Each structure stands twice: as C-alpha cells, then as structure tokens.
Amino acid sequence: MPQFDLRGIQIAKYVNTNGVITYTDRQTAGDAMTANMELRYAEGRLYAESTLAEYMRKATGGSISLGVKYIPNAAQKIMFGSREKQRTVGQKQITGLVLGGKTTSAYVGVGMYAPDMIDGVEKFTAVKIAKALFGPPSMTLQTAGENIVFNTPTTTGEFLADDSTDQDMIEVAICDTEEDAIAWVTAALT
C-alpha cells in the first residue's frame, strides 16, 4: 500500500486491568509530519545434518519515532510525565513544563492514519500501536541566517506487546473514507 501522507497522530494513556487493555485521556500528539515503526525480532536457527533444519522468527517489540510540528503540553504530560511550573515575570504568570530526575514516562497507545492508493482507489490505512514508551525529544536550536530552518520535535521510543492474552503490538485497518479512519483510530484508543 503506497501511503502518500500522514495525519491525525494521537496518544492515550495505556491502562492494564488484569489483562484487559483500555485507554484514557486521548490527545493529539501534534500536527503529523513523520512516523516510523520498525519491528524487532528474536531469531533462532537449528542446524542438523550440516544444514539449516529449522528457523524461527518472532516479533518481540520495536522502535517508534514520531515527528510533529510541536507536541502539545497535554500530550507531553501524558507521554513524558512532565509537570507544570509557574513563574512570575513582571505582572504575568508564565507556565512551563518541567522534566527532572523524578520524571517517569508512561506507557501510551498510539494511533494515526495515512491516505494511500490501492489498485487506483484512494483508501486510508489506520494504525494502532498498543503499548509504547517515549522519551522527550532532543532540542536543537540555532540562530537564523540567510535561510530559515524549522527545527521540529521528533520523539522516539520503544513499543512492546500489550498485557492482554493475545499480546497485541500493531493493528492495521484499511478504511474506505477519511471519516472511517478517524473513527477507527478513536475507537482503537478507548
């Protein structure tokens, strides 16, 4: 499926209740720019009679990175465990976000969708990552020169099997309309 765009990245708090997985506090992760998900595998080979007799490959998790225009504060608090801190500057209260030695990231579910083309017909591929853990993005700042360079955040992390009996990692659905894809992502993160 050749995707040609990316839209609607959302995150939600991951909740495990005795193997029943639900999600709360669904939020946008920011205006979508890039998403990369790559599975990682455990592999095993058995040689017998001087030849490869058995081969096994099993998904164990993977890496994920999300690039967005900016990460909203509400999403940063859920994903990275950031906390708000207010400072008085003149007569104003300015609120910032703090990450520190006691800050702990939390597991989240991730959803998004991508318009694509299947046999000449536009469809929408919706994706859900069941359980992921992210770290705050690095900050790259530079002075303006002759050309304007936008530095946008990319957060990276790991995804792994959820705590259900099926141990889900990634779910993908092909939807006929953008409305269906949005509704699917919303339903997947509840």
Q: How would you describe each model-predicted region?
A:
Residues A132-T190:
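Mixed-charge, glycine-accented linear interaction segment located at domain edges/termini
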Residues I9, K92, L99-G101, I170-C175, ...:
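Hydrophobic transmembrane signal anchors and adjacent membrane-proximal interface regions, especially
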Residues E38, E43, E49, E54, ...:
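Glutamate identity and glutamate-enriched acidic tracts
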Residues N18-G19, I118-K123, T165-Q167:
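Short, solvent-exposed loop/turn segments that connect beta-strands within catalytic domains
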Residues K13-Y14, Y113-P115, C175:
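Assembly/interface hotspot detector across virion components, adhesins/toxins, and nucleic-acid enzymes
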Residues G61-V127:
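Structured, beta-strand-rich domain cores
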Residues M1-F80, K131-V149:
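Solvent-exposed edge beta-strands and adjacent loop segments
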